[in-house]
C-alpha cells in the first residue's frame, strides 16, 4: 500500500512538472490580467491607508499639534501620488507589451490624473506647506485678556482646501448652514456680543460667566453643522472667516468654519477670558477639536469615494470587472461618533 501511494504522488509530481516546464511563453493578456489583480491589491493598500488616516484624525485631541494636521495633508499628498505612479506604470507596461486596451486605459488614467489626482495632490501640498512645523496646539486658547488671533497663511490654507473640496465635494455642504441663534437663549447673535461665539475672535471672551456662554455657543455652532458645511464655510470665507464669525446674525456654519481655520492656521488662537475660567477653556478647546475632526473626517471619506469612482473607470478601460472592487469607501472606515 505504501509503495502504491508513493507511486501516485510521484506521478502527480511529474504531471505538475511537465505542465510548468513546457517552455510556453506567458500569454500577454494573462499577464495583464495578473497586472490588473496586482493593481487591485495596490488599490486595497490605498484604501487601507485612507482608513488609517481617518483613524488618526479621529484621534485628534486638545494636545494635538497644528503640525499634525499638516502631516495629515502630507500623508494625503503622498498617498495620492503613490496611486498616480502605480497607474502610470500600468499604462507603460501595457503599451510596451502591445496590450489592445492600452490606449483606452491611457486615456482613462490621464483623465483621472488631470481632473482629480493632481488637484488633490497640489491642494494637499499647499495646505501642508502653509501649516509647516507649527508646534502650537490645535485647541489654542489665549491667556487671560489675550485677543483672538486668526493666524498666518489663511489664504494658502483656503486655496489648498478649495482645490480638494471642488473635486471631491462639489456643491455638497452649505457654508451658511444652521441658524444665527446663540446657545444661551436662542436669540439672534449680535456683533460678537457678550456670551456669543464671535467673542472667540475678539479682544477677549469676557468674564467667567460670559466666557462660559461663549464656549457653549461655539459648541452649539459646531454641533449644528456637518463636516461638509464646515469645509464649504472655510472655502467661502477664507481670510475673512474670523471677521465674518464676529458679525451680527452669523450662522452656525460661518462660526464653525472660522473655528476650523483658526485651528489649522499657524499662530491661530482663540481669545482668552478676562479672568480665570477653566470651564470656558475646556469647552472651547472641545469645540475646536470637534470642528477639525468633522471637517477632515468628511474630507478623507470624500477623497476615497472620488478616487474609487475614478479607479472603476480605469478598470472598465482595462476590460476587467469594474465592480470587483477590493473594498468600498464605506468599508473599514472609522466613523466619528457622538454621545447623546
Curated annotation (Swiss-Prot):
Main location: membrane
Membrane topology value: Lipid-anchor
UniProt keyword terms in alphabetical order: Cell outer membrane, Lipoprotein, Membrane, Palmitate, Plasmid, Signal
Family: Belongs to the variable large protein (Vlp) family. Gamma subfamily.
Compartments, as annotated in UniProt: Cell outer membrane
Signal peptide as annotated in the record: 1-18
Organism: Borrelia hermsii
GO CC, alphabetical: cell outer membrane
Task of the protein: The Vlp and Vsp proteins are antigenically distinct proteins, only one vlp or vsp gene is transcriptionally active at any one time. Switching between these genes is a mechanism of host immune response evasion.
N-palmitoyl cysteine lipid sites: 19
Keyword Translocase part of the UniProt annotation: no
Lipid-attached positions, S-diacylglycerol cysteine: 19
Protein name: Variable large protein 5
Pfam families xref list: Lipoprotein_2
Keyword Lipoprotein belongs to the record: yes
Anything else known: Genes for both Vlp and Vsp families are on (usually) unnamed linear plasmids in B.hermsii HS1.
InterPro entries xref list: Borrelia_lipo
